[in-house]
C-alpha cells in the first residue's frame, strides 16, 4: 500500500527561491531537515515576482490534483510590491491591490480543496536602504529601491488579510526589528543572511509542528526491519 507523504509548500518571491541556497539563506533547507521523513518541503519561489504576478500564475502551478496531501501552504510575497512606483513601476503594487491579491490567492486555494487553516501568511521583512544601495553599487547593478517608510503599510495589510480570514501569520518585519542589530539579518538590505534564515526557520517551525505530527518518521526505523525478512517492515507502516 502506498504511503501518503504530507507536503509543506512555500510559495513566494526571491525570499523563497533562495531558501535552499546553502551559501545565503537556507531556511527551507532547515525546515526540510526538521521534517525529513515526515513531510516534503516544496519551494515554488519566483525572484522578482509580485503578488500581482503570483495571483496570475497560482492556478498554473497548483490545482486539485497536486494540492492533495498539502498540510501547510505558506504565502510569502510583498518584498517587490513595495518597490517605488516612480523608480520601478513594473514592480510596484499599491497596498490596496496587494491586499486584494492575497485575498484572491486564498480564495483560489480554497476553491481547489485546500482548507483555510492550512494557509500561513508571512509579511515582508524590513528593508535597509543604505545597505541595499551599497550592495548594488559594489556590483554595478541598478535595482529598484524601496521606501523604508511604507514597509509597515504592507506588513499591516498582510496581517489584516490574515486576521480577516482567520489565518495564522508571521510578522517577519516586527520579529526582525526586535533585534537592535536587525540589519545583520539582511545580506544586501533586502534578502536574508544565514542569521535571517535561522530566524525565519525558528518562526515557522512551531506553527508547522502544530499542523504536522513530527513525532514519528514515515516508514519503519531501520532497527525495526527484519534483515532476514525485510518485507515484514510493511506491517508496521501506518495505514
Regions found by a protein language model. Give the residues of each.
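Alpha-helical cap/lid subdomain in secreted, periplasmic
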Residues: 2-5, 30-40, 55-239
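Catalytic nucleophile-elbow at a beta strand-turn-alpha helix junction centered on a G-D-S/GDSL motif
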Residues: 5-21, 25, 49, 82
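Conserved donor-binding loops in enzymes that form glycosidic bonds
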Residues: 13, 46, 190
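Short N-terminal amphipathic alpha-helix/helix-capping patch enriched in small hydrophobics
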Residues: 23-28, 50, 54, 58
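Short beta->alpha junction loops
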Residues: 43-51
Amino acid at each position: 500500500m502506498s504511503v501518503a507523504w504530507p507536503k509543506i509548500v512555500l510559495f513566494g518571491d526571491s525570499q523563497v527561491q533562495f531558501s535552499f541556497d546553502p551559501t545565503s539563506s537556507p531556511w527551507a533547507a532547515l525546515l526540510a531537515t526538521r521534517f525529513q521523513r515526515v513531510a516534503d518541503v516544496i519551494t515554488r519561489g519566483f525572484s522578482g515576482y509580485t503578488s500581482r504576478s503570483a495571483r496570475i500564475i497560482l492556478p498554473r502551478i497548483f490545482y486539485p490534483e497536486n494540492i492533495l496531501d498539502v498540510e501547510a501552504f505558506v504565502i510569502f510575497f510583498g518584498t517587490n510590491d513595495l518597490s517605488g512606483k516612480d523608480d520601478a513601476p513594473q514592480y510596484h503594487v499599491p497596498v490596496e491591490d496587494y491586499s486584494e491579491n492575497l485575498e484572491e490567492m486564498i480564495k483560489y486555494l480554497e476553491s481547489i480543496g485546500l482548507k483555510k487553516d492550512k494557509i500561513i501568511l508571512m509579511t515582508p521583512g524590513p528593508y535597509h536602504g543604505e545597505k541595499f544601495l551599497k550592495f548594488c553599487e559594489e556590483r554595478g547593478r541598478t535595482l529598484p529601491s524601496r521606501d523604508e517608510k511604507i514597509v509597515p503599510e504592507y506588513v499591516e495589510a498582510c496581517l489584516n488579510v490574515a486576521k480577516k480570514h482567520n489565518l495564522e501569520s508571521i510578522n517577519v518585519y516586527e520579529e526582525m526589528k526586535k533585534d537592535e542589530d536587525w540589519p545583520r539579518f539582511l545580506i544586501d538590505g533586502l534578502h536574508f543572511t544565514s542569521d535571517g534564515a535561522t530566524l525565519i526557520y525558528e518562526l515557522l517551525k512551531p506553527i508547522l509542528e502544530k499542523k504536522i505530527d513530527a513525532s514519528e518518521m514515515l516508514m519503519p526505523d531501520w532497527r525495526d526491519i527484519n534483515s532476514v525478512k525485510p518485507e515484514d517492515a510493511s506491517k508496521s507502516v501506518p495505514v
